[in-house]
Structures are given as structure tokens and as C-alpha cells.
Amino acid sequence: MSIRSVLRSRIRASVASASLALFTSASLIAPIHSLTAQEKAGAASKQEAKESDYYAIHSFEVPEGVELEATSFQRMPDGKMAVASRRGEIWLIENPDSDKASAEQFKRFAHGMHEPLGMDYRDGWLYVTQRPDVSRIRDNDGDGQADEFEVVADGWQITGDYHEYAFGSKFDKDGNIWVVLCLTGSFGSDALYRGWAVRATADGKTLPTTSGIRSPGGIGMNAAGDVFYTDNQGPWNGTCALKHLMPKKFVGHPGGFKWYEQAASEMGAKPKEPKDGSRFMVEADKIPEYEPPAILFPYGKMGQSAAGIACDTSDGKFGPFKNQMFVGDQTFSTVMRCSMEKVQGHYQGACYPFREGLDCGVVGLQMEPNGKLFVGGTNRGWGSRGTKSFCVQRLDWTGKVPFEILEMKAIKGGFELVFTQPVDRASAEDISSYAMKSFTYIYQGAYGSPEVDATEPQIKSAKLSSDALRVELQIEGLQRGHVHHLMSKGIRSAVQTSSQEKGESPGQGGSQGQGRGLLHTDAYYTLNYLP
């Protein structure tokens, strides 16, 4: 080794020794930082809470060469699941509740339909809502193929415009199928009852029922049997929304008002036209027939194209969300969750994120009594976060209860939050655990609206109930007609018992101390009416 190499080695060793000494002396002077309880809770929350821990996605394998753009589902008497496609076909899935994923499960039942967007089964017939009518079909010879097709009701018209979809409900308690009919394009109605909801009766009548429809994405019922549909951002719709359908009501878009003369016997006189550029609750106070949106879905936050509707009537087989509604979004490829209540006789409520990561844009949803949520989708003609062209999937509850805001309810001077699991008292009663913003949308004939009239209501107090499942928030500055965005990033659960982790009795137990953060910290309440 040369003298130069020896010198280099000695210099490196000296530098390393000095660095070690400096580190050691610094450690003696400054002890290692000890995490506070709040920091520990924050660190823990980053490691847990994935949606897939609670709701697993099961994907079906569609036969090769088949583009099954699933729009609606219906259980058949033999246990098979009928699934309709935008491409005019109806397929049957064998053993739809199993973990099996094989193309052999699928068999085509019918074809030649015109974009079917709703199905139900009654008295040996599969009823199908398609673009021009409600039809019923059946297999008479038992070969697994539909061979009899009958038109039940067709009292509306079509022009060929691609917007003119027809979404059909299940049978209501009176035996009617509700059909929501898209306008001709976004702004007008060039064919009879376009921009209306109608009811197809068992004896073949078409009853004009509700005006003001723009561009529906789905239709369904809540646990009480009341009918709702989703409408999408556009003229007279600042953002996407969930709306309550009732006879003789108007739900927002005046583009179909020209048909009141034909509907006079069912609907009465035409309502007053809304003022362009107003706010929707200002107009609701002026127009008795106008029923404002029950829930507004903030555009770009909760989705961009609200679609299919399902209600959890499984009595706990889908987790803690009994009787709540679920709404798909085509653009975001997600399923949202909704809780509603009646205030002054009107439905209103909150929406929450629920499950993302579906294969393509969600269109069809169906909740089964066994707690299986079937999901279908497409992205043909529209973009979606999910990259596949179509999908047939199912959401299964894993048996674990997520720590979530179960409900956000309006109370005098604020909101009550109900949780799925007991909440840590210190975080629940610390007002810094919460923040709130409010905003609304312009009610206008132009396409959509930005968020406007923004405010920041102030949370003045937070009180936890004795069972640790409810928090009462008193808030200054609530705004009628606004979406109230609640952010609860500081909330922590009480330390959980093993039984609660398995989904048993979420209201029981719960020792002192902090557990996990909320799976989803955001809730959006549409405050139309004050209690």
C-alpha cells in the first residue's frame, strides 16, 4: 500500500470516529422524542382502515367476446340472477352468491331489447323497462331462452336522440313500475313525456306523475317504499342529486312543461317557472309543486355522474347500515352511502363515501336480502376512473364493522352524529376534532354551477352521549339551502374489544382510551329545512 493510500484510510477512520462521537454526545444532550397520545393515535390511524377490510369486491368472469354492460339485476325464482346489458341482452348467472368466477355461470336469456335499464319479476314474467316501453318476457318451453315478449305500457315517445334513456323501478306497493324519462338532450323535450316520471300500471296504462326530470342515472325505493331517482349535473341542476318522486310534483327542470296539457287529468295546472339564476330553496318557497333535492352530491368530491340506487333491506347482513340507501357513480366508479330523515315533511339527509375501486363506471345496483350488493357498469360513451369497458361485480360484507359516521341528523341549532362504534370521549368533545364548510349552487338554465355562497359555520360545542355512540354538535351559522360539509379528522374510536372487531353489538363495551380514526371523515348534509 502506498503512503498516499495509508493516509486516505487514516483520514476516513478519523472522520467516522468523529461522527460517531458527535452523534453519541448529541444523543446524551437531547433524549429521544417520546410520542404524545395524540401523535400515537394519528400514527395508528395511518396504518389501518381500508375499505377492502370491510367490503370485498367479487368480480364475475363474463364469457369471452361478450360485452356485458350491466345496467340492472333481478333474482329469478330458481335462484339465478338476471342481468341486463346496455347492448340489449339479458343474461342469467348461475350460483350468483358463490365465490365462483367462471364464464360458465352465464347463459343468455334474451336479446334484441332496446337498452334495458330496469327489471322486476312477477307471476312468471320478467318485466323489463327499455327505451320505448315496459315489456314482459318469459320462457314457455323451458329451454332457458325467452320466447314470449309482450308490451305492457308504452305511453311515451322517443326521437332517436341518444339521451332518451328510460330507467325503470321495481314494482311499487300498488303494483306500478315507475319510469324516469330523460329529456331530448340536456335542455328540451321533443317527444311526449320526455323529462317526466310516469307510472306503468298493471293494466297497461301510462300515468304522467312527476315533471322536472333532466338526465336520470337510476331509480329505486327506500325502506318505506318511497321512490327516488338520481339526476345529473346540467341545466337547472347545479350538481348531481338524489330526488324524491311524488305524484303532481315538479323536481327542477322546466324543459318538459309543454306536456302539462296532455297530463292535465293527472297533474293539474302547470307550475310557475323557476327564476333563472336563483337558489333552489328560494324557488321552493315560491313554487308549491317544487320538491327540492333530498341530497346534493358535491360535484368532483362525491362523484360526477350519479347512477343506480339500492336500499339495504337485508336486516344487518350487509353490516351496520340497515335501511340506508346506496348510490353508484359512473364517472368515479364508486358506490356512495346515504342516510335520510324527514324534516317538515320533506326528505333530506347526508351522503358519505363508501366503496371505491370498481372496475368501471357504476350504473346498476341491486341489494339482495342475503346482504349481497350486485354492481354493474359501463364506460362506453363516458369516461370513468375504472378502466374496464364493462363489469359485473358484487360487494360482500366481511363481517367486520367499520368505524364510521352512521348518520348525520339535523337538530335544533346543529347536528347529531351517530357512530357505528363507541367514540373516545376526549376526541368526541374536543371541538377541534371537527371543521365545517357550507355552500350551495346556482339554480339556473345554464349548464351546471360552481359552488357559491360559501360560509364556515362555527362549531361551538360537542357533547358525547352516555353510550358513546352519539355526539351532539351545536353550530353557529347554519345555512338553509346549503350543503354542510363536515370534516371529522380528529375523531377516534374508543379502544375496541375483540367482539366489536368481529361486528358484534357495536353499542356494547368500549374501554377508555383512543383507538382508530374514522374510515371516512367527510359527510355532506343537504340542509333544506330546519327542525
Label each PLM-derived region with a short phrase.
Residues 1-14:
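N-terminal secretory signal peptides that target proteins for export/translocation
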Residues 14-31:
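Bacterial N-terminal signal peptides
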Residues 38-414, 425:
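Beta-propeller domains with acidic blade repeats across secreted/periplasmic ectodomains
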Residues 413-417, 471:
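Structural beta-strand segments of beta-rich domains
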Residues 420-461, 486-497, 521-524:
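Short, surface-exposed alpha-helix to beta-strand junction/turn motifs within ectodomains of secreted
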Residues 496, 500-502, 506-516:
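Intrinsically disordered, low-complexity repeat/linker tracts enriched for polar/charged residues
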